[in-house]
From Swiss-Prot:
Record's compositionally biased regions (Polar residues): 903-926, 1057-1072
Segments forming a coiled coil: none
Compositional bias (Gly residues): 1137-1147
Ranges annotated as biased composition (Low complexity): 883-897, 959-978
Stated name of the protein: Protein efr3
Feature: compositional bias, Basic and acidic residues: 598-607
GO terms classed as biological process: protein localization to plasma membrane
Protein family: Belongs to the EFR3 family.
CC annotations in GO: plasma membrane
Annotated spans, Disordered: 582-615, 877-929, 942-1097, 1114-1147
InterPro entries named in the record: ARM-type_fold, EFR3, EFR3_HEAT-like_rpt
Pfam family, one: EFR3
TM spans (from-to): none
Amino acid sequence: MEGVRQKCRPKHQVLVLKCYPQYQKGVQVVKPNSSELSYLLYYVSTRRSKLTKVGAFLEKRAARDVWRRKIGNVQVTLQILSALIEKVPRDLPIYARSVMTVLETVVRSQDISMVEDSIETFETFCRHQDMAALSAEQDFATQYREVVRSYAGFAEGDPSTQSKLAAGPPLTVRWKTAGLRAIKGVVSSEAGLAADGGDSIRVILPVILENLYSPEDNLVGSLELKLLEADKNESETAHRRRVSTATVETVDAVEGDASLAAQNTADMDRKAEMDMRLLALRCLEQIVVNGSSRGQIRVTTQVVLDFILRKSRVTGNGLGHNHKDSWATSLIELIAKWCPVQVRFIILVAAMDILHDIPPTEESLDESFAITYLIDRLLKSPVNMIGLSVIDVLLGLLRHMSFLISPSRAGKSTPDEKQNGHSNALELSVKRTEVLSLLQDCIGNLTTHIYYGEQVVDMVRTILTRFRPSRGNEQAITSSPTQSDVLGGASAMISSGEDGLIAFSLPNAKITALRAIKNILLVANTKRPGFTVTTESRHQVGLYVWEGTQWLLSEPDRDVRYAYVDAFLTWLNLETSTDDLKVKERTGRPASQPAKNDLSDPTERPGKRTASMSGNQREKVILIAQSNFLRLLHLTIFDLATDHPTSVSEITLLHLLLVSLVKHLGVNAVRFGLPMVLKLQDNMTTGDGQSFPALVNIGSLVYGYLWALSEKFDLDTSRIGNGIQSEVQKRQQLGVWLETIRLPPVNLDKIIHNSNVQASGRGAQDVSLLIPFDGGEELIQRIEASYGSFITLLTHSPPSSPGSVGSPPRSITAPVLPHVSASAATPKANVLPPAVREQMLSPWSREACLAAAENERAEAKSLSRSRTGTLVMRNHVHQNGTSSPSASSNASVPQSAYASAAGLQNAQRTSVPNSSGSQLISTSRESPVHVNELRRVLSVNEEGKARRMSPLRGRLDGSNRSVISSSSDSMVSGYSLSEFDDGASVKPQSTRGGRISLDGEETPKASALSFMADTNDIPPVPPIPPSISIQGGLTDGRQRSVSASRPSTAPGPRRPSVTNGKAGTPSTSPGRSLSRDKSRSSTGLAAAATDGVEPNAEKIDSARLDVQKLLDGFLSPADAETRGSRRKARSNTGRRGVSGGLGRPPY
């Protein structure tokens, strides 16, 4: 019967059965018969219909062998499946279910030997599996996940998935190793992880982390070193020399380990466990390295952070400030290091999402602290996260901080508290205070890596624009202008809704945010030797970011005032430089004051002024914001000194602030501070009802400020300086001086510590001893002289020199001062601007200060409207050429501070003004030629791109004849200072007649509408072809060229002098006609060209060659090289003879 049964079997079953060899019991490894297996593979590869039948038969065979515990037959079945997958991988979806069924049968056997044998087949399947089939067939996908989950259960140590005999540690490690080997096969296939949307990661990653977890802090670090060492050994083994066949080696010599041979079983168990953990780390590395998709990295990060939180809840060992390195921090930094650079920032984004999901209750503070601590470690680690949205992370941290402080979010508010508004209703616990302190550090560490130039500026401004006054300080806000809308007011910054408004009205929120600003400045100015130098150098945080925050100095809460002063003093110490000691005047020339050498007619000036003014609008708005802040800050100081004259701590704090302003800002602060201090003195001396301690304190504050001015501007040797020093010493000797007023001023920490200490006993209480200061005019003269000496020293010192006063150089790109090149060489630059001097001499009043602040705020708004109205419209007409960066702003972009946290309504960052580009000056009839026009037109070598201009040009009057000179000074005289304006980064096109020219900015064409203004005027003349010229004449004045690379001081070629529009010596020689591309003279004036006959190139004489060689020297090398290919002879006759071309053409 058996023979009959075998003959009745199908051929595929016969071929499969022939692969099983005859073996004896006790054999460890059984392999299929090689020849029969080869024939079976050939049979199924040529007959695809047999694949399903072979798979089904192997399923039955494996089930019977597993039930009978025939491990050898199971090994053969698994090897047949592996060979089948490698032979016909394209047809794997046909028999994939059979493979999964066999593996599932083996896994359920709970036999460690069978499970270990099945791993190789599973790895082969993972390498060749089809993701489309895995995603399309739900039943097959479910079966695949069950197999993966079974293997993960082995690695997890789940007793339900392991044999009951697995009682000893060696067998447990063996089970875990088997499971991790299978998991490595899953994670090694990038497609396998991405196919199921992260479900496999959620199954296997906790198992991997469980095998990596250890209370030891340095376990991950030691495993990483072993992993690197193992990779190095593998690479060395791969390149190992071949062993000679004559050398006889024993098995022990090849595979033995002498160190292991000398150890006991416990040591070997520890080594096996370490190898198991190392395998788990390899699996984690494969997940992270292969996670090129953002979704996969996000899922990985979420699973890791959830595991860390779960372990911290179970063990009770949370993270804290005293934990420098822990298992969790080492793991998260290692993952960030392995992660691909382009998706590394997803780790922080996922961590922020988890932080937002944690409720700000007292029970969840440990989780909030743990996630924030891990974020902080990532931010201050050497790992650079390119692509990270710093402002989004900052806003997320600020939002979480507001949730922690807000009573409603913390669940502590009552209906009565909601009706009474926000007070300090929420008492901060110790743990909540620790979380807030960690948030401060986390915000500061955001500046560890600089990703763009305006990063620090944007961060500081983002925080400052979110403050709201408390109920007791609303009068301080309503009585003074708030932040300028042009620089992005606070109202434009709030994006988190009502919660942000509530939280940032609380004193605790203000204190935490101000301390975070201090941390930002400290970290940004800290040099870390272990970090790589960033390619992006950051910009200096300007004074304008503090605009609208002066009311924080008058907050009812004392800690808020101290935190504000601390943050502002930190900015003064770290972000100011020598440039901040200079007085920065507003650039640009009013419309009623034309340039000294500007010879253009009135129709030409508005366009030029618009270009210049638009380029300087940013600087003007910044200067307005700076002056407004200093004006209102000194007004706040005046109010505080008037309201609290007897408070020693307040007067000392104001003295520290005033002295620091003078030290770091110089005349920029004195112009507002000196009139205010003198007014404060007048109010104290003329007011009635003032107590004697108040008079002493205010007098000490006034003379302390004058003392600081004397020290700052080196007035000790002058009469006014000696008088100030004498008065201070006399008051100190008589006991009518506040002891805390001294130079250098008292430290802020000492002021805070002694805030409740009152002044000691006074001396003789005689008001006549307090002599007021009355030498204001002489003091201002001495300050002006000292400032002039400082500017002179600074001008003649090297650029890298810090000057006489200033902070040491830092790695900050300072803003470019406008018009330095034009004004530094003139003696007038060493004199204090008249407006500043007049401001210091004029009397000060609170009403005038508020009115001036309101006027400047209105001016800033008008500048913003003009920029978004006219100039932005012009910025859209650049259709060709290279557009200026500042000219590419879009008028449709919302004017919000989040789009530009520095506050200016353009797409560029706003600290450093743009100075690139040259002006475009619109031309018209009756106007002389400007050299900038020549440079612009003739910078284009192609004839087709040359600007076409009408030859109509008015007769030159006597005022213009001085320009027509053949000397080297003629070109310099043709320039005006406005043409050297480096602030004209915006290049507007001509908009005459209400229409916009759509020509390119590099080669704009004259609009035809400019010649049609008056129909009764001279009719238009078509442009002369560039290839036609006349004998002895000059090319058209609109087409002459001066190379853009030619220096402005280069000598021009000699030409005959001109009198009354006629040339003294007519140039009618045939050899003296010039090409269109040659520059005639430094003024560039020429006669109109006429149509002519094709010239003869052989009639060029030596004189013409000499002139051409001379002109070639004035042009750039690129222009000179192209002259030979385009050089043509000129005609001997023309339509009209021209003897100089300086008059109006006779039509």
